[in-house]
């Protein structure tokens, strides 16, 4: 039986980036992913995933808890079931919240590390954005975005 230093549950962007860092530091890593291999060409096309929503082998749908602010309605929540995670089924969209979103987190938690000035540095380390440089985007990280 093979023994691993770390087991990561979820083969999405976060899991695979973390695995890469651990491997570069000499650790052995096992990634466990519920879904299929990311080999469908529609997953690599902007909006190509839309036809696959109905009965997709790459998505699992859950119901939210009843939402009092919405008349106790429940909503479908799609969860990726594919190696690559939500990044494989999100229409190739990448975005961050606006700075005030993160400042709300600071107000809620009292922890400045959740603020924009702190988190934008993390985003920059993760991004490999060759189109938009500047002070708010990174261009040497493991996640290719544009």
Where are these regions (language model features)?
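Gly/Ser/Thr-rich beta-alpha loop segments that engage phosphate groups in nucleotides
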Residues: 12-17, 37, 82, 86-88
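Active-site-proximal beta-strand/loop segments in catalytic clefts of secreted hydrolases
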Residues: 11, 32-35, 80, 92
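N-terminal FAD cofactor-binding segment of flavoenzymes
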Residues: 25-27, 34-83, 112-122
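A short, basic/flexible loop-to-alpha-helix module at the beginning of a structural domain
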Residues: 1-3
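Active-site-proximal flexible loops/turns
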Residues: 22, 40, 92
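Rossmann-like flavin
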Residues: 76-146
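N-terminal Rossmann-like FAD-binding beta1-loop-alpha1 element of flavoenzymes
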Residues: 5-31
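Residue-level detector of alpha-helical segments with a strong bias toward transmembrane helices
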Residues: 15, 25, 43, 94-95
């Amino acid at each position: 039986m093979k023994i691993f230093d770390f087991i990561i549950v979820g083969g999405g962007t976060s899991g695979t980036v973390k695995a890469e860092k651990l491997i570069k530091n000499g650790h052995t890593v096992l990634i466990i992913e519920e879904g299929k291999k990311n080999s469908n060409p529609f997953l690599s096309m902007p909006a190509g995933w839309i036809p696959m929503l109905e009965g997709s082998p790459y998505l699992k749908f859950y119901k939210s808890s009843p939402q009092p602010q919405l008349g106790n309605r429940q909503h479908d929540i799609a969860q990726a079931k594919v190696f690559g995670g939500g990044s494989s089924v999100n229409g190739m969209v990448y975005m961050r919240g606006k700075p005030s979103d993160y400042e709300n987190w600071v107000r809620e938690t009292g922890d400045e590390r959740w603020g924009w000035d702190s988190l934008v540095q993390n985003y920059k380390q993760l991004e490999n954005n060759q189109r938009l440089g500047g002070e708010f985007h990174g261009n040497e990280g493991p996640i290719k975005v544009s």
